[in-house]
């Protein structure tokens, strides 16, 4: 599955680097320069942790615990989704994997169990929960350096263009307050855009 895909990609990258050096398209120093960058290793470690979280089902268990604790109403379910994203945000460096691979299937399952399906009564709960999930995913993607794959590129650009260095903790300190405000207000804000909410 995903392990084979990662192995194939890694092999392709290494073969590409080797061919680039052999054909003098780049020097060996240029080919290996990225391996000495701490941001690169931070992202590699985060992807390894993410693989473990997804493969072991830990992400799903975290989300279900949040739902168990907060999900007494549909708005509570919205907060459970936000809490799950907040916990998983710094650990899973792909917001697509986090949102689409962990959170979305759980949200879809909860929506269907409440009798809310895409073709049948989506406004009961599914519409609201999917909106919360999608927006919470984007908020947590911006909160942490490892929140999404593009953030390390932004960090590197800030260093190269402006001379400003964003490490993981600096990024988190800058993003935590606006992120928490966004996650706290999101379920209530989106509640007013939903036509009707049921209580469970």
Model-derived regions: residue spans:
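Membrane-water interface of alpha-helical transmembrane segments
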Residues: 7, 68, 72-75, 124-127, ...
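Catalytic-loop motifs flanking and including active-site residues across diverse enzymes
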Residues: 8-11, 150
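Juxtamembrane and boundary regions of transmembrane helices in multi-pass small-molecule transporters
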Residues: 95-99, 114-198
């Amino acid at each position: 599955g995903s392990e084979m895909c990662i192995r194939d990609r890694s092999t392709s990258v290494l073969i590409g680097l080797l061919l680039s050096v052999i054909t003098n398209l780049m020097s060996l120093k240029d080919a290996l320069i990225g391996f000495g960058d701490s941001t690169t290793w931070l992202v590699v470690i985060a992807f390894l942790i993410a693989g473990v979280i997804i493969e072991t089902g830990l992400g799903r268990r975290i989300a279900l615990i949040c739902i168990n604790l907060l999900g007494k109403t549909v708005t509570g379910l919205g907060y459970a989704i936000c809490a799950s994203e907040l916990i998983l945000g710094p650990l899973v460096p792909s917001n697509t994997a986090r949102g689409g691979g962990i959170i979305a299937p759980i949200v879809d399952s909860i929506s269907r169990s409440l009798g809310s399906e895409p073709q049948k009564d989506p406004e009961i709960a599914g519409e609201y929960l999917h909106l919360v999930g999608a927006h919470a995913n984007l908020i947590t993607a911006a909160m942490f350096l490892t929140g999404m794959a593009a953030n390390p590129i932004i960090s590197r650009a800030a260093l190269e263009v402006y001379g400003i260095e964003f490490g993981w903790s600096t990024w988190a300190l800058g993003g935590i307050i606006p992120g928490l405000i966004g996650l706290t207000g999101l379920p209530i804000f989106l509640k007013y855009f939903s036509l009707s909410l049921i209580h469970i």
